[in-house]
Amino acid sequence: MPAVVQVHDLSTVFGKGAQAFSVHEHLNLTVARGELLSLVGGSGTGKTVLLRHILGLTQPTSGNITVLGRPASELGGDGASSRVGMLFQHGALFTAFNVLDNIAFALHELHTVPRALAHEIAMVKLCMVGLKPEHARRMPADLSGGMVKRVALARALVMDPPLLLLDEPTAGLDPNGSDAFCDLLRELHAMLGLTVVMVTHDLDTLYALSTKVAVLADKRVIVHAPPAEVARFDHPFIDHFFRGQRGLRALAPAPAAAPPAKEP
C-alpha cells in the first residue's frame, strides 16, 4: 500500500549552543493510505511537533518528510488544505466568523468557487459532521465544546483532503461526547477513505479508532504496529501507559446493564 506520509531520518533541535536540546533524533515513520494512526508518547516527546512538521507549519532541523509524494515544506502555500486537513486541539475557530464562514474559510481565501457555492459546500460539510442547518449562523461563543470540535472538523474537511491530522480530538469532551465524536470519526474515515494521523493521550479514543499506533520515546518511533501488538512491546513507557491502571480500564469490558427491577 503506498505511503501517504513518509518521515525519514528526522531530527528536531530547539535552542542554540549550551541551551540546545533535541526532541527527535533519526526518527522514521511511514503512514500507509487508509491507516488511522495514533501517535502516543510521554510529555516532551514531540508528538505535536511532529504533527506540525507533517503539516508544514514548522521545519525539522534535518531529515525530510513527504506528504502525498511532495515535500511537507510545500504544504504551507495555497492549496495545502486540499491535501491535508487539520483539527487543532481546541478547535481554533475564528471568533469573529459564524459557523458557516468558519467552515468555508479556505474556499473564501482561495477564491476557488463563488461565495454562494462556497456556502453550499460548507453547509454539506456542516451536515456531514452531524450538525443542523440552523447552527450555520451561530457564533463560536454560542457553541458547546463538542459542537466546536465538529465545526473545526467540517472546516478541516471542506476541501476534501485525503489526509487528516488530529491533535487530541476528544480532549475536553465528556465520556458521551467523546464516544459520539469517535463514532463520527470512524464513520468519516470509512466513508471518505481518509488517512488519519492523530495525537492522543486518551486510551479509550486510541482503542476505539486506531488501526496502528506509533510510540514516540527515546527521541524516535520505537514501535509502529496494531494496538494489541504495541501493548505487548517491552518498554517502560508502554508498560506504564498500556499496562498500567488506565490501560487495564480501557481494555476492560463494559459492565453489563442491571436487569430491570421487578414489581413487588
PLM region spans:
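Helix-to-loop junction immediately C-terminal to a conserved catalytic motif
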Residues: 55
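Conserved ABC ATPase "signature" region
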Residues: 116-134
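Conserved ABC ATPase signature
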Residues: 139-143, 147
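Conserved catalytic motifs of ABC-family nucleotide-binding domains
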Residues: 160
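Catalytic Walker B motif of ABC-type/P-loop ATPase nucleotide-binding domains
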Residues: 164-167
